[in-house]
Amino acid sequence: MSTIEKAGRPMLLGKRRETLGSMYSLVGSHSAVKLCRWQKSMMRGRGGCYKWTMYGIESHRCMEATPSMACANKCVFCWRLNTNPTATKWRWQVDEPQIIVEGMLSSHKALVSGVRGMPGVTEKGLEEAMNPRHCALSLVGEAVLYPYVNDFLHVLHGKGISTFLVNNGQFPDALKELRPVTQLYLSVDAPNKETMKFLDRPVFPDYWDRFNQSVVNMSEKKERTVFRLTMINGFNMSEENIPEYQGIFETGRPNFIELKRLTPAFSGNTRTVLRIKNVPSWEQLKAYAKRLCEVIFDGKEYEVATLHEHSGCILLAQKRFKINGIWHTWIDFEHFNAMVLDPILSARIVADGYLRPTPSWALPESEGEGFDPAQTRHVTAKRQKYLASKPAGEE
């Protein structure tokens, strides 16, 4: 790393740093970590997030982070309230990967320590949470924008930490050069150019071309790939959108497709055009997932494999992950980490080379609709009142 790169101005200064520092635990000059509610929930035995149900990621052992607070979009549905910088290229001081990772782990431990004493938190759960085994690079910003993202990933893998990297499809060249991660995501926020401009508010004028090139680049990746959709009533989940999604999915051929309904986090964001009416019901989401399965490759390629009603997420998987009638959407993390650290084995990584069977409680027909029966679901008094006010069978 050159002296010039180290001497550049920091990404976050003054009021912006103060504002973001109140929302995240900032690491160095451009990175951050944060505890999510599911981490605390699983520490208390109250259930994990959809990534536990679908992939076997223990929520309390997952560190949510980013090596770049900057992003090329200002999405209207972003529940981070768009306080982070926008950028089309890196123009700031660059922190070293090793220092970033060490800072993240230190900050994460400090955040977890703050949960000690919370009702239901056990010492075992707390100790496990202190030593994360997974890193969700989806906190905020665009991870692939960080110039040394591959070195950063290598440091994480070297510590036995699996990597789940989300990208918005605006940096196709960086995506193409990205080395294998445990699971690679592309956000598909809209099925067409006009809707993407409205929902994502991209800063690149050629955003649609960049996105489509990223779809092609994703199709060339050998590790597990996921196309991630935030479903918004009235914007991106009409019947007319189905053939548009079909074109994207048949080009990108992702191993998995996540349909996650809009998170109704509108409090404090008076400028958003979104309202509760834009949050699809669970039944609407399931119906849309079924339609996509029927249409993509004429129904020959994908099925609903798992779901998690609690967080409003449904996973479509390529049928090749259903081995001898049993879904294998879970991940063998130890096997992946052993491969990715070996220069020879790393080149041989393939999506179906590090699988584990999906537990029966995670399947679509499960009684708990993806909620782990070993956990205890906690329903707040406010939620109980809301459910009691709804007609039977309606959310």
PLM features per residue range, with description:
Residues M1-M69, N73-F77, L81-S107, L387-E395:
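Flexible, acidic/Gly-rich N-terminal and inter-domain linker regions that tether
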Residues S2-L12, E18, V27-S29, K197-D209, ...:
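Radical SAM enzyme [4Fe-4S]-AdoMet core and its adjacent flexible, acidic
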Residues V33, M63, C135, T225, ...:
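A broad, low-specificity signal marking well-ordered, structured residues that form hydrophobic/aromatic
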Residues W38, S68, V140, T230, ...:
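Structured loops at beta-to-helix junctions and adjacent beta-edge loops in soluble globular domains
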Residues H60, M130-P132, H308-G312:
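Short Gly/Ser/Thr- and Asp/Glu-enriched loop/turn motifs at secondary-structure junctions
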Residues A70, L81-L139, P147:
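Conserved alpha-helical substructure of the radical SAM core
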Residues A70-K74, K193, P264, I323:
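Short, acidic Gly/Pro/Ser/Thr-rich loop/turn segments
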Residues G117-R291:
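Conserved AdoMet/S-adenosylmethionine-binding subsite of the radical SAM
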